[in-house]
């Protein structure tokens, strides 16, 4: 993974939902939707019910060309050094 991509990990109590490179991620935050791009400032935020959207990175782009979505009831996200960790 180069500096042009984020590494996204989404976990639930049952399983790892996604673990791989992405171009961007869009979240349902308590104060409204927000998007995380490469080199985003470090944050920790709570998430509300809604839809997480993300575009797969170059390594997976040939297989998954569309924007991927995941419906959640809530959770938390941490962003640090281009790694995005989500617990839903």
Predicted features, each with a name:
Residues 1-5:
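Short, charged, intrinsically disordered terminal tails
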